[in-house]
Amino acid sequence: MTTEHNEINMPTKYEPSNVEAGKYKWWLEKEFFKAEGNTDKEPYSIVIPPPNVTGKLHLGHAWDTTLQDIITRMKRMQGFDTLYLPGMDHAGIATQAKVEAKLKESNISRYDLGRENFVDKTWEWKEEYAEFIREQWEKLGLGLDYSRERFTLDDGLSDAVKKVFVTLYNKGLIYRGQYIINWDPEAKTALSDIEVIHKDIEGSFYHLKYPLTDGSGYLEVATTRPETIPGDTAVAVHPKDERYQHLIGKTIMLPILNREIPIVADEYVEREFGSGAVKITPAHDPNDFEVGNRHNLPRIIVMHEDGTMNENAGKYDGLDRFVARKEIIQDFKDLGLFIKQEPHLHSVGHSERTGAVVEPYLSLQWFVKMEPLAAEALELQKTENKVNFVPARFEKTYETWMDNIHDWCISRQLWWGHRIPAWYHKETGEIYVGEKEPENLSEWEQDEDVLDTWFSSALWPFSTMGWPDTESPDFQHFFPTNTLVTGYDIIFFWVSRMIFQSVEFTGERPFKDTLIHGLVRDSEGRKMSKSLGNGVDPIEVIDKYGADSLRYTLATGSSPGQDLKFSYEKVESTWNFINKIWNASRFVLMNLDGMKYNEIDLSNVTEVSDKWILTRLNETIQAVTSLGEKYEFGEVGRTLYNFIWDDFCDWYIEIAKIPLYGEDEVAKQTTRSVLAYTLNATMRLLHPFMPFVTEEIWQNLPHEGESITIAEWPKVNEQQIDTKSSTAMATLVEVIRAVRNIRSEVNTPLSKPIVLEIKPKDTTYKEILEQNISYIERFCNPEQVTISFDVEASKTAMTAVVSGAEIFIPLEALIDLNVEIARLEKELEKWNKEVARVQGKLNNERFISKAPESVVAEERLKEKDYLDKKASVLERIETLKEV
């Protein structure tokens, strides 16, 4: 279908809100983003990393999804059957914490509601926030196939989760056992490592005496957590530490509790650290747990799940753990067993959701046995069907982690999530694990715990495609997926788990490539956080500058694997770029004279400028396509920017005005054809980055098809590449630029004619200039041009050197020297004042000591800038005085 637009439908000013209004809904109505599932077309699929249904998406999500959308839009235009699958994560503790906080406002706890009612309330939250997330996806312009939207708790994915759990259990790869886990005493649940935020806390090292049972002395131990002392079951020393050789095998009388504990030898102990003697608390420290296993030590839990001390803590039973810490230290002092207290800055884990200090805690949990699964996944990386990490260095990061993996704690003491499909017989205690409920259900009690959120999201690439139904059309057609886009911070928690689960259950890699990006940081390189107050809401950016500005800024602001420094100045710069495109497009449209798509005719292209812009267009098509395949979107952005801003807008459009405003109708029509053809192709190249504005411009241009979203990706036309014209145009551009720079230096407008003398280095350069003299006349405005090997610069000439020539412009005919010197001396006075002012500040010790570093740095930059400007003006004055 060909749609023609004879009237210009583009307002004078680029207003992103107007341009973006209505387009997304139209795209959805027309089902442009709906994958066909057509086996005749080559498939291309990306599954969105499912955001948590907990609220607003942040700038990291915007970056992540923009990259995915760029890839899928590009592939759709290249003719692939493209699926960009949306979905959301139930997010376990994150969502439950939000819902509990909301209930708390009404003085209601989840226990007041009961499990079933609380889960119903959480589903209501999910529905509300899922809609909010979809609105944000719409604002960003993501080309998602909503007919395939999934949720980690929907029926299909729940079936997949049960299947995986039961299969792994039956293989002996899921087991129930005691282990040290991260425990949140406020939420009363285990936490994954990613849910623990480490903060540097100013604490204390307490040095204490542990008396030997035989009364012959004591060992000095140091701890940051005295509250765990009631759980000590040994003191460890290094087996080769000569200081303690005679004590190994003897016992300590644990103070206060008066429990006899052994002195054991273990290489875990660092001889040089502290006294070289370490208290061992197997139930409250992961390293101590391992030491305890090696020495068959008892494990004594001394806290309740809420962080208060329990009956094993003796007299401290019922106290909050931090109150107990103070009382234990006081008791050591009273017993004369306190040596000293030293300040100690150390990293302390806090719950990401509740803020509570995380307790290493021995708990009965469900685990995945990771070693065999990791080995299988690592074997995949030795085959041609490996997952390709982009950049490749992250493969080593992944492999190192998999080589050193620990068993994965998958149970969580929550109500919101996939309930563990395990039941315990009320009388016999027998365990039943199955995809379906046991018979005689009333005789069984289901496990109260739910699965770690990452358990279901690890199945995301294949569960969303219909697995465990391996005959599902989407599973057959779109799996394995093509590209996963994600941050380097979750390679361990998500990427690795998707790989081993996919290998185990499908025999395939989950995705062919994984594009790893960094973190979004502020303009100073700091991580965005609430405490710094430097977070940015992407929707606010869109409301001010438009989605296209934000998308292009995010996509082109970094290389794969690198962090992105975000600033409003960069977004504003992109907005200016789009405004330039808008204005150039309006100029083109106003000069097409109602041209229809089938009237575009490039058969009469003879002008060097026309051949040059078509050559540059094809070079740009080739570069953008090639760089896009390698995910080098920063380079794609620079390539497009240079072509559009420099080549097309600054040069070709200016050159095109000559035939457009002339009398030659054939030349006019050819120029219109080149303008329409080039702008149409350029909009298609730019479309994945800026979907809204490119659709608007493309619809106004002569075009073929219903929407740019499904228009054909531009292909290189070898017949349009003319290197001779490219060389000629490069020659003309450098000469014209040099002349313009000289005019600027001596403050002479283009309207004033000049005498121009050019001394070429060789015949080829000379011929190019002579054959294209009209360009020099049009853009340099000379009253006289001399192109000769014999010309030499006069004493009064301004000169410039370009790659193939020397350029001379005699000054006496150009300016009134006395007037120009007077003007420059006035400017010099201005810069002298600015230099004096800024140096006055920088020489003021009070300013230097009290002003923030960033302010001082800014003043130093000003000083350099003002000194440079002063030197430049002085140099120009001296040059003119010599004349």
Swiss-Prot record:
Specify the domain of life of the species encoding this protein.
Answer: Bacteria
Q: Which Pfam families match?
A: Anticodon_1 (PF08264), tRNA-synt_1 (PF00133), Val_tRNA-synt_C (PF10458)
What Gene3D superfamilies does its record include? HUPs, Isoleucyl-tRNA Synthetase, Domain 1, Valyl-tRNA synthetase, C-terminal domain, Valyl/Leucyl/Isoleucyl-tRNA synthetase, editing domain
Task: Identify the NCBIfam families for this entry.
Answer: PRK05729.1, valS
Q: Which organism is it from?
A: Listeria monocytogenes serovar 1/2a (strain ATCC BAA-679 / EGD-e)
Return the EC number: 6.1.1.9
Protein name (record): Valine--tRNA ligase
InterPro entries for this protein: aa-tRNA-synth_I_CS, aa-tRNA-synth_Ia, Anticodon_Ia_Val, M/V/L/I-tRNA-synth_anticd-bd, Rossmann-like_a/b/a_fold, tRNA-bd_arm, tRNAsynth_Ia_anticodon-bd, Val-tRNA_synth_C_sf
Residues in a coiled coil are: 811-847
* Locus of motif 'KMSKS' region: 527-531
Record GO terms (molecular function) = aminoacyl-tRNA deacylase activity; ATP binding; valine-tRNA ligase activity
Q: What gene is behind this protein?
A: valS
In terms of one coarse class, where is the protein primarily found? cytoplasm
Q: Position of motif 'HIGH' region?
A: 51-61
